Amino acid sequence: MNDLNRLKNEYFFMPDATRGAVRYLTTKQLKETGTEAIVTNTLHLLIHPGPDIIQKLGGIKKMMGWDGIVLTDSGGFQVFSLIHSKKWKGSIDEDGAKFKSPREGNTYELTPESSIDIQMKIGSDVLVTLDDCRKSDLEKEEAQESVERTIKWAKRCKDHFEKEYGGTKKTGKLLTCVVQGANYPE
């Protein structure tokens, strides 16, 4: 099941293990369903339990007792939605996002580079580049800005992944991206 090349040619149902667990199922039960891949979330795992703790535990797979594929979403959507909620305070600019978690009051910074570092500490098989996720009813000009920022961030993620970790050839991990653009197909 660790043949990540299959992901390039096949579709997978990936249950949401946002915080390192699929709700209402044990890892054993999840395996019994035939599930081959799960999706976790960089932002939520950054906040709790934290990438350093996950790394000390041997990565998300050991922490969960999971031997399938793990895709880790970059956290772009969560940053967008949580910063614009009343509980979270923060900002997004060309460098990335800065925000304060109401959970424990800590301030975090998520940049394209730190997103890759966190996903590597988590031990993800498929890393997702940080994206500038915005509301879907944007004016076309704002959507274009979001697409341009997402592309810039994706390039920064890729450059960091290759420079610091040796890229896919050295790590065996895949790097992918999220397509933005609101409701504008072009």
Predicted regions mapped to residue ranges:
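Non-catalytic, usually N-terminal nucleic-acid engagement modules in DNA/RNA processing proteins
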Residues: 1-168
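Glycine/Thr-rich beta-alpha phosphate-binding loop at enzyme active sites
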Residues: 141, 160, 171-186
